[in-house]
Amino acid sequence: GELARKELATQGQFPRDFKYEVQEMSAPATYIAKLVNAKGPVYGISTACSSSGKALVSASTLLDNDLADVVIAGGVDSLTQLTLNGFQSLESISKNICQPFQRDRDGINIGEGAALFVMTKNTPITNNGVMLLGSGESSDAHHMSAPVPNGMGAQASMEKALKSAKLSCGDIDYINAHGTATVKNDEMEALAIN
């Protein structure tokens, strides 16, 4: 989309092969659905850093409520000038390696990536598979780009996930923190985890 907009600005028209519909947030989901001839709900989720996790929770909800037998869920993130400009305006991009929770932290490193999961209802754990044991969500609605300082939203999400999975804090061996290496996020996340 960004290159097409540049061509529009310089040439007065979009490239011949430009298709607006592939710029839509749901375009990757629509493409995959057509590729595998999927039936049922097809949509994209955009909730910033939580989008891929939210997609897995949404897939689990579809399965749990018998709205689907099999769901392809995951996430993709492309590095665009819009993304770079956004993080630069927040002054959160590090010029060094990302060091969450470290004293000399100075921000994140951003890149591209994608992952997809095929999820089915009540699939036992096998050597080649994993199971989503539980999930938890919250919204502290504190600020568009800053978490609530006391970490209560993140803590509520983790508590809901533990309850959903029928686990206790002592059952957890690893926490995959958001870990942005920004002062506000790291302080909040440390409080929530503690």
Segments from the language model and where they lie:
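Conserved catalytic cysteine-centered active-site region
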Residues: G1-L8, D17-S58, T83-N109, A190-N194
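Short glycine/threonine-rich loop-to-helix capping motif typified by GTGT followed
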Residues: M144-G151, T180-N194
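Acidic, glycine-rich active-site loops and adjacent beta-strand->loop/helix elements
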Residues: T47-S51, G75-T80, G136-D140, G179-A181
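Condensing-enzyme catalytic core mediating Claisen C-C bond formation in acyl metabolism
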Residues: I97-A165, Y174
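Conserved small-residue
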Residues: I32, S52, A59, F87, ...
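Beta-strand segments within the central parallel beta-sheet cores of soluble alpha/beta enzyme folds
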Residues: Y43-S46, V71-V76, G129-S135, G170-A177
